[in-house]
Structure formats: C-alpha cells, structure tokens
C-alpha cells in the first residue's frame, strides 16, 4: 500500500522536534514580581511596656553618635554598579589518519595460483589492497566584553550572626520597545558601606547580578532558531 504523504509527514515531525529542542536552549525570560526579589519588610518590634514614670523609656532611645547606614532587616541600601568584564577563548584541533592494507593469496588448498590463465592474460592471483586517509581540522574562537554601570537600591533581607548583610533587590524600567531589568543579590560587609549609605558592586561577596530585558530590542539580539541549529552541538559538521 502506497502512502505518498508519509515521508512529508515524517519530515514535518522531525522539523518540529528539532525546533522544540533548539527552543529549549534559549535562556528563560525574566518575569516581574519574583517573590525572591520582593522587598523585605522590617520585623515588627515587640510592644513596649507601659509607661512606668521613669525618665528613660524603652523604645524611645536614639543613637547620638551613629550614622544612617543600613544595618537591620528591611533597611534600604544603594548599590553602585561598576562592572567591567572581558573574556576571550580560542581552540584549535587537527587530526589525521592514514591506513594501508594489502592481502595476497598465492595458493589455494595446496595448489599454486600462478598457473597459466586458460583464457589468456596474466596468471591467476587473488590479492586485494586498501588505502585510506582521513583528516579533520577544527578552529573556534569566542570573545565577549561587557560593561554595566548605574545604581540599584535594594533592601537588607537578613543579617548574619557575624554582622554580614544579605541584600537583594531589582529595578524594572519600561521603555518604548520593552522592559529592562537589573537584579542583584549578595553579601555586604557593613564596613564597606559609605557614609551616604552606598556600596560598590565590586565589594559584594557571592554577587548575583542579572541584566536582561524583554521586547523588540531584546529579541533583535537573539539569533533565530535556524542560526542556533548551525551553532549547536546537533550540527553534524
């Protein structure tokens, strides 16, 4: 039974499967209102005892010699972004293989094969030979340079027992062509915070900095699925 539409259907299914695999290689798009980067509210203090007539009352103390730097959960701190990174990588590989094989048979069941050919020509001789050569060369290069400047104001999410501040937050900007976001999380030492309540991003330990976006501008910087196929490990050549 002939089914002329089956090969075309198979090609369609294979194409859809390939597109699905390639789409899985694309980095997921960040979405707003991520609960991990939501502002952390200060812990509710315990209710103070009623006024007992003393001059000093708990809950009304003020630090006369301190500053306004963040040091508690829920405090706000501004992070100054000053990130510059450049990386390059090159790889070259070359492989070659040559092989030669020969088989000669001059006798069969004890009888020589170099007798006269009854139909004329050369003597009978069973022999075979094989010569092969294979060469593979590859060359790949990659270079990347990034720069990120600006500022993001985040909140203190936790205070570790040694006084280190765990901070995280994000900034969303809606532009004409889409949304731009900057997310940052990490650990800040209180001594690195300046008097104006700012800290450089280079002083953040275990920093997680994300700069991404959505919309037409972000889409133009992404290669199409056909280009990703030729740059993926699925490409056989």
UniProtKB/Swiss-Prot annotation:
Main location, first listed in the record: membrane
Residue positions of covalent lipid attachment, annotated as S-diacylglycerol cysteine: 25
Protein name stated in the entry: Flagellar L-ring protein
Gene it is expressed from: flgH
Alphabetized GO MF terms: cytoskeletal motor activity
Chain residues carrying a lipid of type N-palmitoyl cysteine: 25
A Pfam family matched in the record: FlgH
Membrane association type: Lipid-anchor
Record-stated family: Belongs to the FlgH family.
Keyword Transcription regulation: no
Keywords recorded for this protein, A-Z: Bacterial flagellum, Cell outer membrane, Lipoprotein, Membrane, Palmitate, Signal
Disulfide partners: none
